[in-house]
Amino acid sequence: MSHESKGPSKAPEFVAALKGAGFDFFCGVPCSLLKGLVSLLDHDESAHYISATREDSALGMAAGAYLGGKRPMVLMQNSGLGVSVNALASLSTMYDLPALLVISWRGEPSLNDAPEHILMGQIMLPILDLLKIPYRVLSPGTPVEPEVAWAKKEMLATKKPVALVAKAGVLE
């Protein structure tokens, strides 16, 4: 299993972009590929990060936060996307409850990852397509601020979830 770092983590820049775009509710289920992001949010008292036990529970929290006037972000490993399919299809999407999904890409086809991540790594983007969730992929060389701005604009325009998929090394 290999998760080679491809330069410094963009987690600090990402958190600044999220806050600058008005995201003010942060929850999710941690993943090692998101450890830099989780650590920053967890130690930032103004972020009020809530660690959930399941990804579908985090989506429920995000729905409530949105209804309460917040702009939510939910983080998860891509295996958590599988756990979240029903909540995304029958709650978030159906009832126009937007959230930014920040999803780590375990089992990315070009990487040597643990065997349990390989299939989900192959089918994650098609699942997002089937759910009609627009997404962008964050690579180590990708500037994050324009991607966060795109996500905010898309969420506000559609009132639906959108996703930023983080490759290994981006938010570690």
Name the predicted role of every residue range:
Residues M1-E172:
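Thiamine diphosphate
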